[in-house]
């Protein structure tokens, strides 16, 4: 749950403590400091700043959330539970910035990777809405059929029914 700058600072401090402990021949502290620095580096590759980005997204600070997500240089190294949320957040940010081609790409990847049911419903709803904007009836209906297979709240069901009604009017 660190930014990259905070991770670097923590690693440097831990390595300095380890070096100091090694100088005073307290090898247990040296080993502990190195292991903790290793866990911070491991967290960078496996977790990334996704939790911080999600917090910024909920605060409606979309640019900050996007900047945090884009600091992840190799998203393919993320934990398999974090990858879908990386794509989901990027897709939702793209929807809010009205960049529908990127939104469709990221939300499509997130839907395939395995989101929780509620988040999957939101992703499929956005994908159906993007298909409606693009006047792509077939693709929109596929997303709606997929969304109907999962348990959704009444709010999402009513939104999907409205999207489906509008999709059926497309010739």
What feature does the model see in each segment?
Residues 70-74, 108-113, 146-151, 155:
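Amphipathic alpha-helical segments of tetratricopeptide repeats
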């Amino acid at each position: 749950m660190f930014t990259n700058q905070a991770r670097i600072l923590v690693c440097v401090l831990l390595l300095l403590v380890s070096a100091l402990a090694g100088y005073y021949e307290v090898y247990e502290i040296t080993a502990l400091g190195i292991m903790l620095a290793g866990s911070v580096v491991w967290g960078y590759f496996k977790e990334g700043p996704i939790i911080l980005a999600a917090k910024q997204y909920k605060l409606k600070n979309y640019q900050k959330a996007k900047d945090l997500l884009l600091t992840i240089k190799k998203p393919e190294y993320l934990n398999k539970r974090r990858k879908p949320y990386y794509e989901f957040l990027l897709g939702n940010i793209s929807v809010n910035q009205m960049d529908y081609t990127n939104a469709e790409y990221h939300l499509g990847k997130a839907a395939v990777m395995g989101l929780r049911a509620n988040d999957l419903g939101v992703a499929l709803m956005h994908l159906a809405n993007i298909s409606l904007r693009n006047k792509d009836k077939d693709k929109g209906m596929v997303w709606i059929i997929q969304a109907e297979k999962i348990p959704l709240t009444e709010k999402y069901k009513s939104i999907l029914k409205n999207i489906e009604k509008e999709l059926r009017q497309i010739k």
